[in-house]
Structure formats: C-alpha cells, structure tokens
Amino acid sequence: METTFRSALVKNFLGQSPDWYKLAILVFLVVNPLVFFLVDPFIAGWLLVVEFIFTLAMALKCYPLLPGGLLAIESVLIGMTSPDRVGEEIAHNLEVLLLLIFMVAGIYFMKQLLLFVFTKLLLNIRSKMLLSLAFCFAAALLSAFLDALTVVAVVISVATGFYSIYHNVASNRSDGNDGNIDVGDDSTLVSDDHKQTLEQFRAFLRSLLMHAGVGTALGGVMTMVGEPQNLIIAKSAGWGFVDFFLRMAPVTLPVFACGLLVCLLLERFGVFGYGAKLPERVREVLTEFDRQATAGRSKQEQVRLVVQALIGIWLVVALAFHLAEVGLIGLSVIILATSLCGVTDEHAIGKAFQEALPFTALLTVFFTVVAVIIEQHLFTPIIHFVLQAQPSSQLALFYLFNGLLSSVSDNVFVGTVYINEARAAFENGVISLKQFEMLAVAINTGTNLPSVATPNGQAAFLFLLTSALAPLVRLSYGRMVWMALPYTVVLTLVGLLCVQFTLAPATELLTQWHWLTLPSIEAATH
C-alpha cells in the first residue's frame, strides 16, 4: 500500500513516539492559544508549566526538547512572552549554559582517571551500605565546592563506563570496545542469566546514582558556591563564604546528618527501589577488567592518569576560589586534557560534546517557560501571600513555598525572585535586618532541599534523567520521583523544623560567640 503524504507526515511527527503521545502534544498546541486569548493568560501560563512537566515525565517516550520546544515556540508566537524576555533569561543563565557545554565535555576527557578511581572504590568496598554512603558523602563534599551538574556528570561518566564494560563482556565483546555496539540493545546478550544479572546491575547503578544525586543537594545547600542561586542570595545579604556556611549550618548540618541516615536505612531495608547489591558476576568482570587494565597499562597511559589527576586538582582549586566563570574553567580542562593527553582529532573531541548539547538546548527551552512565568506573573499571588503573613510564620512559609515552586520551576529563578522581594520588604521598612537574614536562610534552604522531589526541581536531576545513561539503567521520571520520595520527606521536614525552631536560637548563639555579625545595611542593600 502506497504511503500518502498525510500518513508520512503523521509518522514523521515526533518519530517513534506512541500515537497517544503525539495526539496529546497536538491537543496542547491547539488548546494553549484558545485559553490564552479566550479565557485567561494566567491560566494559560500555568497550563504551559503543567504541559512542560508532562513532557519531562514522558522523557523516555520522546526527548523533551522536541515537544517542549514546540510548546515554547508557540508561547512566544502567541505573545505569552517575548523573544527579548527569553534572551534576557538566557543571558542571566549564561554561566549555567557554559557550564553544561564545556564542563561536561571537560569531564569526558578525564574519564580514564575517573573510571580508575571509582573502579578501585567499587571493588574495595564490598558493603553496599558503606558504598552508598561513600557515594552520597563524596557527592555532597564535592558539591559544596563544585557545581552539582559537574558532580553528576562525573557520576554519569563513571556509571556509563561500568555499564559498558559488563554489557560488552555479556555480549561476547571482551575487548571492552563499546564504539561499535549499542549498549542499550539487550538482544546481543548471550544468555538469560546475563540478562537477569544485567537487571540487578541496573538496579544497583540506579541506587548509586540517586544517592549521589541527593548528595549533591545536601552539599550544594551548604556553601555560597554550591548552587548558582546561593551566590545570588549571599550577595543580596552581604555574606562572605564563611558567613554563608555558618548562617546555613543550623539547618544544613542536621539535614545533612539525617540525609546520610536515610541513605543507610534505605540500603539496610531495601525499600523504594534501593538495596540491590553488585552481582558477583559483574564484580568478577570488573575485577578482571581492572587487572587487565593495570597489567597492560603502558607508560604513556600512566602519564595520562597523572596528567588527568593534576588537571583534577586544578579544576577543584579553580572552582573553589572562583578563578573564572565555571564554563571557562571547563574549557581550560578541555584544552589541557586534550593537549597533554594527545587527543588531536576533531571527531574524537566532538564526541565529548554529544552528551551535554541536547540538554543545553532543553535548558534553553526551559528558560523560555521561566520567561512565561515572569511575564504572566504566575508566582506573584503566592509571593504576596507569604509577605503578608505574620513574622513568626514567614520563615516556615518562605521555606515551604520556595520548595513547592522550586519543584516545578528553575531554582535560580525562584531563589532570585524571593530574595529580591524580601530585600525590597527590608528596604521599605516592612521587615527588620535580622528578619531579612533569617528569611534569606529560609529561602536558600527552601530552594535547595524540597526540590529534590522532582527531576525538574534540580538541574542536576534533570541532567541525569535526560542523559544517555538513564534509559540504559531504566531510570524514568516516575522512578526518580519514587526513589527520591523518602529523601524528599525527611529533608523537607527536618529542614522545616530547623528553620522554625533551631535557626533563630542557633544564630543568636553564634552572634554571642562573635562568630557572626550583622552586615551593614549598605552591604545588605547593594
């Protein structure tokens, strides 16, 4: 039967996605202008936010860039926002985009070192509880000084390496060369036993990825360089590095301890998708791979590992002291790693950018949705409600509403909007300087902690969800939400209790010890 133009067009639209999914996106595209022009732009704006979250939730059906991009283009065409506003949002977040483009590519060129270090870690720590704790703690420690996206990129690179090694062996490709095999194709596996082992290995990797992902949130909230919005809040409040850490400590340290405890309990009782152990067959494969790699490592390869280790030290120092924009530091890593490790072919260099560029494009689309949120004042009623509450209730309300909005929007945007509103209230004499500082802590912790609830709440989680690794280990949107649920509940509740009951007395105590001083009004208002 001859294919008609219409049927060919329908088949081409969103490719292999299910027909019901294609229909849903078409309905969204038809309904949005009708609601915007005939009902209410405010409702249309929230409808767009819900639809965009839907595309993220269905990431395994179709990469969200396509349907999300169509919705974003339409929102600009019908006037929900303007190209200029989108351009402003991209300009405000240029540092994040540069980070994705260059830092993730830079990590790619340190893959040999990362695989070497983490293979030793994986093989030497046989207890899954201790291994999970090590991943969570290491991710938290790194995220306190590096960006969470960088840390997640490292973990993804390592997990992909482990997965590829076993999949190649299970597919009778013991040479470890994954360049010509689709590691997502289980039909190449030689036996059902290998398939069952691979399923257990996937569950093992999923749990480590989630522990590390939550670890980035636990560490990222502690310091002013941990997350982009932290820096904005610190500047607004006039805090330095040590000041910021001490101000947050009454909330972040108890939350950190409880987060590590949750990590141990989840592995101990094997609930919410955790508890899977490293299969012995996989351990044997990785041990043999490590033995062969060690025995066959030439002097040139040893020098590469040393060079990559030195570049890693440069990376940590440069990021910790903010010697340049994060993305530019990533570019320096690319230049140093390729130059000193002998990677000179354009195609070999180009592979490093394959992982991050689709997500960079998706994040740019996300900034269009954020522009709609700003243009249509979608969060304004919530912000006004919180600011009109009694001072005794403001801390808890700021914390909770920040967490709620950060779960569906951009953390940087939510944190910026709230800190600007709080500062304006202080400048207008509505709240005192002391209350403003307490609110700044509530805003920062509220933006960072409850937002682990959904992948779109944390850029690092979204990056993990849309990475090439996620479908390999069967990590979907729903599964991420389910696995993050115990962390979400504990971190949110402990954070709320600390904000409400321990923040004020602990801050007062630190002030009495002269560890903290109120910044000058000029510092807080500039």
From Swiss-Prot:
GO molecular function: sodium:proton antiporter activity
Pfam family name, one: NhaB
Subcellular location: Cell inner membrane
Keywords: Antiport, Cell inner membrane, Cell membrane, Ion transport, Membrane, Sodium, Sodium transport, Transmembrane, Transmembrane helix, Transport
Annotated membrane topology: Multi-pass membrane protein
NCBIfam families: NhaB (TIGR00774), PRK09547.1 (NF007093)
Protein name: Na(+)/H(+) antiporter NhaB
Gene behind the chain: nhaB
